[in-house]
């Protein structure tokens, strides 16, 4: 079992939760980033820094993650590529990406991108608080249990 993290966009609190789960359940964590990020000092955690470039980390994740593994990412187009490949994907707020919801998630992402470009809505998501951490922990637990049975 392996959990991949799109580390450039994943909150530290979510990364810490993943490592805590990994230590308890004995699975590998691979953090992929376009720049150096703090790597927890545990042997089960690897950090891969990819050459900078448009979507370099995304491309690496799609190329290396395989069905039966989980990728933590906020990027909806990346999640779509992973789901099409049969890889489980979860955002740091506890929302799982799957074939049933990808169309809606992509449409919402595209709409908000257009509205932001037109200046009609502000930037990103709200703060990453206790509610988000708890939702993420619950979803992570559920998905890891499901993938471990496969």
Curated annotation (Swiss-Prot):
Which Pfam families does the entry mention? DUF188
Top-rank taxon, per record: Bacteria
Signal peptide range: none
Q: Which InterPro entries match?
A: UPF0178
Output the NCBIfam families linked to this UniProt entry. PRK00124.1 (NF001095)
Concerning HAMAP family, the annotation shows: UPF0178 (MF_00489)
Q: Which family does it belong to?
A: Belongs to the UPF0178 family.
- The protein depicted here goes by the name UPF0178 protein PputGB1_5282
């Amino acid at each position: 079992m392996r959990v991949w993290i799109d580390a450039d966009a994943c909150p530290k609190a979510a990364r810490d939760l993943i490592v805590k789960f990994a230590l308890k359940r004995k699975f590998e964590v691979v953090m992929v980033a376009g720049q150096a990020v703090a790597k927890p000092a545990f042997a089960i955690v690897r950090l891969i820094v990819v050459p900078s470039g448009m979507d370099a980390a995304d491309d690496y994740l799609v190329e290396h993650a395989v069905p039966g593994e989980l990728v933590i990412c906020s990027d909806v187009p990346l999640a779509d590529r992973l789901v099409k490949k049969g890889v489980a994907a979860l955002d740091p707020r506890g929302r799982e990406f799957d074939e049933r919801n990808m169309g809606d998630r992509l449409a919402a992402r595209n709409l908000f991108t257009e509205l932001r470009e037109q200046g009609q809505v502000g930037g990103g998501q709200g703060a990453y608080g206790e509610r988000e951490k708890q939702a993420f922990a619950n979803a992570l637990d559920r998905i890891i249990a499901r993938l471990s049975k496969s």
